[in-house]
Amino acid sequence: MHLRIITFLLLIIGLGACSTKKNTAINRAYHNTTSRYNGYFNARELMKERVQTLRDQHKDDYSQRLPIFIYPDEKQSQSMYDDMDVVIEKCSEVIERHSMYIRRQEKVKWIDDSYFLIGKARFYKQEYGLAEETFLYVYQAYKKIPERYQGLNWLIKTYIEDKEWDKAEEFLDLGESEYNKIPEEFKGMFNAVYADYYLKRDKDVPKAIERLENALKFTDDKFHSRRYTYVLAQLYHEQREYAPAMRYYRSILKMNPDYTMRFNAKISLAMAFDVSG
């Protein structure tokens, strides 16, 4: 497989397929392939590694409502600076060398992904103003691809963390107006972000519950499914709705959580049972 890729690259380089100004099939093939197998892949893997490290090092306080999302505090953010700068540098090089933005349409499929990674790197560095600019660009510039809604989700996340409540609400409303256009793979996150907005503004716990339950319907990965489920159990428990709280605590026990989450789910389940009558 790797030999085929190398042979293909050598062939198209030999044919002089380096222009980013001419929309030809061979130019698109060259820049799609080289952007994917050069900086973008390395940047994506580095981002995955650092986010996983952040999750592994995170310690939840089960005496409090768990946060829906795990973000770095100031000290953790600073520890990520060097790696996030590498992500930004690699993705910026991909964009500079391989972008084919012709007639208001990007012809290279990894360019929007590179912008998105730059936005995430800025988010984790807590450079919220720069992150907002990047995610807004992804959402507005790539109107013909579904990944624009990934940019929208992270744009709203950024507004929430930056306490730009009016802007967060504006783009939540915008996302809601386009809800039927959002691909299912991004609907789970959109609903979870909506729930996060309600909870961080202390606005409406029942609506947050509704959004998190919707998020679960569209969420496949175990990490987020477990987290949404535990927060739902806590929210129902807080509302003294013990039957659904116990149902979600029991669900957690079937989802292969880590020892700490399992232990606290059992304790909370017993407490909910005791007061449920």
Which residue ranges define each predicted feature?
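Acidic, polar-rich low-complexity tracts and alpha-helical solenoid repeat scaffolds
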Residues: 18-277
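N-terminal secretory signal peptides that target proteins for export/translocation
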Residues: 1-2
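Sec-dependent N-terminal signal peptides
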Residues: 5-14
